From Swiss-Prot:
UDP-N-acetyl-alpha-D-glucosamine binds at T14, G15, G16, N126, R162, S190, I243, A262, L263, T264, V265, S266, E267, Q287. Cell wall formation. Catalyzes the transfer of a GlcNAc subunit on undecaprenyl-pyrophosphoryl-MurNAc-pentapeptide (lipid intermediate I) to form undecaprenyl-pyrophosphoryl-MurNAc-(pentapeptide)GlcNAc (lipid intermediate II). It is a peripheral membrane protein. Belongs to the glycosyltransferase 28 family. MurG subfamily. Its EC number is 2.4.1.227. This is UDP-N-acetylglucosamine--N-acetylmuramyl-(pentapeptide) pyrophosphoryl-undecaprenol N-acetylglucosamine transferase. It comes from Vibrio vulnificus (strain CMCP6).
Amino acid sequence: MKKNKRLMVMAGGTGGHVFPGLAVAKKLQQQGWEIRWLGTADRMEAELVPKHGIDIDFIKVKGLRGQGIKRLVLAPFQILNAIFQAKAHIKRWQPDAVLGMGGYVSGPGGIAAWLSGIPVVLHEQNAVAGLTNHWLAKIAKKVFQAFPGAFKDAPVVGNPVREDVVALPDPMQRMQDREGAIRILVMGGSQGARILNQTMPQVMAQLGSGFEIRHQAGKGSADEVRLAYQQAGVEHVEVSEFIDDVAAQYAWADLLVCRSGALTVSEVSAAGVGAIFIPFMHKDRQQALNADHLVACGAALMIEQPQLTVDKLAGEIQKLGRDTLLSMALHARAAAQNNADQVVADAIVALTEQK
């Protein structure tokens, strides 16, 4: 009896790493592959991955930045320990390949796979390569990038995006005959965004009627944000901690106001929705660079956080009529690269056939 091929996915920390990994895993499961995950027990993958029917192994590893002198002194020993933990999991399960999608777990996991003679495939979701992927790229058999600029020569394939988002009807079909209030979806990513939670109630109070709002506030923030809208006198608002059916929310929206994490940018494009991006402040402008191509093609606007004011954001929203929003949505959909999951899955299959 022929043995099924096996893939170990290394990804954790945020939805931007985990969801693309799940998308690739699903493609390979459809081809009969067995999938196992390597993650950390205290991050979102510990709860999310098993819900998708995938077993997960854990290692103990944390980031190195901003942890103080004691942490930096201990870091080499903790990294070595994490590599040995990962190597033990790999030896026990014997994967045919490993896929690194980012997060702290990918570093020790990728090195352990390399030491074990297992081919490593990397996918960098952001326009600026993370520290882990920057180093792992030197030992990986295949490297992909979602946006130009992360690596010099790696193929640009976009981000793996959930199938229900890709399958949404064309923006023309969804939006052409809409009338009435402009629908604004506010999203701060899986962790929420305090700056959006604080700013949007004031923005909508200034804009007045003619809008409907759905606001994803993040864990533990929904009551506070709901109260802020009430105190600002804003009606027609739904506030939630999380959005379970994100595809349905994209289909509903005329405009997104959101961060520009890698997965959000790719989903906005795949769905075909115009956006105003408020990038998270980072020293290498990672989120701003993620969204640059959508701004350049007319699919989005961007206000970097130091320039964000209630007046400025309200003014930008006020300019966007239905014709402009439809045009932005069409440009977003035209810029989408929706087959990254298949491209990465095919590369993994090809690598294992060469062994």
